């Protein structure tokens, strides 16, 4: 089943259920995609307006980037579900003999690595989404500036949620050096892009209250 083909109602019903997927990872990817789509909407509301003719080409380039990024995040909704399957299978492997224990440890290590790769990819995409939101807030139509602020907040939430999904998997890794490297990669993205998202929000909020 391709989760991205479900209706909103069906997706949320599955999310609310005990079904293994979607979970927090897929939901984060969807929220990030919604954030990017909001930014793209700001761009579409800006193009073709005489007032913004000077930034028309820049906005069109942002829109092209946003469309590609949204599709990437949509694909990561399903990718997160796909990554959970081998992880669940690994936990179910027998470990009665030393050979079985060794095999389970190896399979689990590989599955945990795969389960970290998807949220790290979602994080990377959300960082791009926050950069786009910043550009849309700066250059886009003032009539849609609130949506640029929402875009930044959506991508920020998805970024933080995905960091939690990295952490829950690295915590279970026996290779602590590898786990630390993945945690550091996530931490660097948080350190750089959470302040940018907050900056976009504060800028938009200040403009709306002026």
Could you say what each language-model-derived stretch is?
Residues 41-53:
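Transmembrane signal-anchor/signal-peptide helices with a preference for the extracytoplasmic
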